[in-house]
Curated annotation (Swiss-Prot):
Compartment(s) where it occurs, according to its Swiss-Prot or TrEMBL record: Endoplasmic reticulum membrane
Lineage of the organism: Eukaryota, Metazoa, Chordata, Craniata, Vertebrata
Sugar attachment sites: N152
Topological category with respect to the lipid bilayer: Multi-pass membrane protein
Presence of the UniProt keyword Transferase in the record: yes
Gene from which this protein is expressed: LPCAT4
Name of the protein in question: Lysophospholipid acyltransferase LPCAT4
Keywords, alphabetical: Acyltransferase, Endoplasmic reticulum, Glycoprotein, Lipid biosynthesis, Lipid metabolism, Membrane, Phospholipid biosynthesis, Phospholipid metabolism, Transferase, Transmembrane, Transmembrane helix
Listed Polar residues bias regions: 493-518
Described purpose of this protein according to its UniProt entry: Displays acyl-CoA-dependent lysophospholipid acyltransferase activity with a subset of lysophospholipids as substrates; converts lysophosphatidylethanolamine to phosphatidylethanolamine, lysophosphatidylcholine to phosphatidycholine, 1-alkenyl-lysophatidylethanolamine to 1-alkenyl-phosphatidylethanolamine, lysophosphatidylglycerol and alkyl-lysophosphatidylcholine to phosphatidylglycerol and alkyl-phosphatidylcholine, respectively. In contrast, has no lysophosphatidylinositol, glycerol-3-phosphate, diacylglycerol or lysophosphatidic acid acyltransferase activity.
Length: 524
């Protein structure tokens, strides 16, 4: 490969962005032999009794939840419930809920700070959100209103509790639902204390407590003061964390119920009053509150989040999928017996060619409908349900173990680079660059576009030459290692593919704690 002149490309700062933070999506629980013996004994004796009694109490909650809303019309439920229903049912649910968590082993809830009134802070924001036990924070908050998925209404008992709570419901299948939720949050938050407080988990999903995920702006759209609420589980062994990669629901429940005693600390921080700029910009407001809470917790505030169904971590100035869908696509196609000989068929460099699912199956010679649908769904579709065959060619080329990294990056450039209006050379513009990074690294398009603009700023054009792109993807001190990790996906027969968090013989580099590191060699 021609390296070009030294002035063609300048590497980015080798230490870009904030210091590396822990990976919040992976929770590893290491038990000693003595701890395993203890959990086996207590898990056989204590856990079944606790879980059984807790489920009995859960079903005892249903009559109180039903009684509070029985006979009320939809119009009446649009206003806060008062009178005897509020007094009897609210106190009944509050007492039984505390008993439920007590039976599961949460013998102590230690409260620090002072909860603000609904006039002082109409909205409460709780973090870190690390487990399905986190609703315990509702108890010292006097059962505030919550935001939940509309689909949960059909879950026995849980649906009744959501109606009792007069929860704000959002539907994943209704595009207009989010707008209505925003309007309802604003209506309640600006009611002058008429409505009880609304509690949000602004991270939106669970992590391992080692870092705060990016806060979603929903809790901050109304622009009213919020009170941050910190949740800590100061136990010697972290059995409660329920992260994307780690112990599942049943194991977390069993391990926690097997503990003799679990403690929860709930701390109310001072009310955060937004500035005029924050009131107008919910994202700025959310980011600033996140930093305040992270500082109080002593953990990093990160940009990590879920994009779709994939966890995304931050490496330098780029967001990448913790485990790219490309690896999952490889497993699907290997099971179907796809040969690498079909990699480049039909792809025209620099020109998009949209294909249907049927043509996709013909090109790859796939016959099983389930395999075809799963593989086709990996690629981004247009409004007509078609995909660009260049995307297919690049993804399959990346899964072909016989290609070098230089060949892969050259192919990526050739497929997506465009002719210049003036000049003989072809350049890789932001759309092609973001498509490549989305396919190979799982990077969201906005993050890739921002990085492209930064790379082009070091040069004199709006696009990248082949030399510049390969210097970035192969030789940059940070991103070069990232490409070498993700373009050498692990080939394993295990049920789950290996995440890039641990070094392996098949991985020249690995992601550790959110940063790219080279594996140690023998004798180091």
């Amino acid at each position: 490969m021609s390296q070009g002149s030294p002035g063609d490309w300048a590497p980015l700062d080798p230490t870009p962005g904030p210091p590396a933070s822990p990976n919040p999506f992976v929770h590893e629980l290491h038990l000693s032999r003595l701890q395993r013996v203890k959990f086996c004994l207590l898990g056989a004796l204590l856990a079944p009794i606790r879980v059984l009694l807790a489920f009995i109490v859960l079903f005892l909650l249903w009559p109180f939840a039903w009684l509070q809303v029985a006979g009320l019309s939809e119009e009446q439920l649009q206003e806060p419930i008062t009178g005897w229903r509020k007094t009897v049912c609210h106190n009944g649910v509050l007492g039984l809920s505390r008993l439920l968590f007590f039976l599961l082993g949460f013998l102590r809830i230690r409260v620090r700070g002072q909860r603000a009134s609904r006039l002082q802070a109409p909205v409460l924001v709780a973090a870190p959100h690390s487990t399905f036990f986190d609703p315990i924070v509702l108890l010292p908050c006097d059962l505030p209103k919550v935001v939940s998925r509309a689909e949960n209404l059909s879950v026995p008992v849980i649906g009744a509790l959501l109606r009792f709570n007069q929860a704000i419901l959002v539907s994943r299948h209704d595009p207009a639902s989010r707008r209505r939720v925003v309007e309802e949050v604003r209506r309640r938050a600006t009611s002058g204390g008429k409505w009880p407080q609304v509690l949000f988990f602004p991270e939106g999903t669970c992590s391992n407590k080692k870092a705060l995920l990016k806060f979603k702006p929903g809790a901050f759209i109304a622009g009213v003061p919020v009170q941050p609420v910190l949740i800590r589980y100061p136990n010697s062994l972290d059995t409660t964390s329920w992260a994307w990669r780690g112990p599942g629901v049943l194991k977390v429940l069993w391990l926690t119920a097997s503990q003799p005693c679990s403690i929860v600390d709930v701390e109310f921080l001072p009310v955060y009053h937004p500035s005029p700029e924050e009131s107008r910009d919910p994202t700025l407001y959310a980011n600033n509150v996140q930093r305040v809470m992270a500082q109080a917790l002593g953990i990093p505030a990160t940009e990590c989040e879920f994009v779709g169904s994939l966890p995304v971590i931050v490496v330098g100035r780029l967001k990448v999928a913790l485990e790219p869908q490309l690896w999952e696509l490889g497993k699907v196609l290997r099971k179907a017996g796809l040969s690498a000989g079909y990699v480049d068929a039909g792809a025209e460099p620099g020109r998009s060619r949209m294909i249907s699912q049927e043509e996709f199956a013909r090109q790859l010679q796939l016959s099983d409908p389930q395999t075809v649908a799963g593989a086709f769904g990996y690629f981004q579709q247009d409004t007509k349900g078609l995909v660009d065959f260049r995307d297919v060619a690049l993804a399959l080329a990346a899964l072909d173990g016989g290609r070098s990294l230089e060949e892969l990056t050259r192919l990526a450039f050739e497929l997506f680079a465009e002719e210049q209006a003036e000049g003989p050379n072809r350049l890789l513009y932001k759309d092609g660059f973001s498509t490549i990074l989305h396919l190979l690294l799982g990077s969201p398009h906005p993050a890739a576009t921002a990085l492209h603009a930064e790379l082009c700023q070091a040069g004199s054009s709006q696009g990248l030459s082949l030399c510049q792109f390969q210097n970035f993807s192969l030789h940059d001190p940070l991103y070069g290692k990232l490409f070498s990790t993700y373009l050498r996906p692990p080939h394993t027969s295990r049920g789950t593919s290996q995440t890039p968090n641990a070094s392996s013989p098949g991985n020249p580099t690995a992601l550790a704690n959110g940063t790219v590191q080279a594996p140690k060699q023998k004798g180091d």
